Amino acid sequence: MKATGIVRRIDDLGRVVIPKEIRRTQMIRVGDPLEIFVSANGEVVFKKYSPVGEMSPLAATCVETVYKVAGVPLAVTDRDHTVAAAGAGREALEKPLHTGYVHLIEQRRTWQGTPGPVQICDGARVQAAAMAPILANGDLVGSVALVCRGQAPGEEEILLAKLTAALLGRELEIRLGGLNEAWH
């Protein structure tokens, strides 16, 4: 940590500037929530907070249930990596998202595979045939990808991805309660 450390002063309001180089390499965007805590040896640590990552067991249960009942492979992502997957999407678990997929998520609307499938993660050959954003209190927190199975997805499959995204978004709203206002 000392090799990449930079000394910064705290201003009168208690603010610390995180240098652009660190924000870029750690993929910290404007508005991203950061968890601040003190380690046992007195270090103040800033950690990216992923609301979707916090509920990865629930996300895994949702996508596994959809896969068992309907045979539809889904993958759940936060804004940086895949947190849960079922079926063919398991190869993408814990992998960073591909930049093309990140651009789809940032559009904040359902994407239905036009012009063709998009790679979900770097380092995995898993592609999305459709994608539904996960929104919580109006904030984009992740996505549910319908994993490509070789043919164009049907309306029912896309609906299952949208339903899963809506359920996870609503659960996040319930869990976060009033925390979202503090992020702004």
Question: Where are the language model's segments positioned?
Answer:
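Intrinsically disordered, low-complexity terminal regulatory regions
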Residues: V7-A84, I174
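Juxtadomain coupling helices with adjacent low-complexity linkers
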Residues: S56, A60-T65, G100-H103, G142, ...
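A short, aliphatic-rich beta-strand micro-motif
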Residues: A128-L135
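Structured interaction and signal-relay segments at domain junctions
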Residues: V63-G123
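Short, small/polar residue-rich loop motifs at catalytic or cofactor-binding pockets
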Residues: A3-T4, K68-G71, V126-A128
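A short local loop/turn or secondary-structure capping micro-motif enriched for an aromatic residue
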Residues: M27, G53-S56, E91-K95, C121, ...
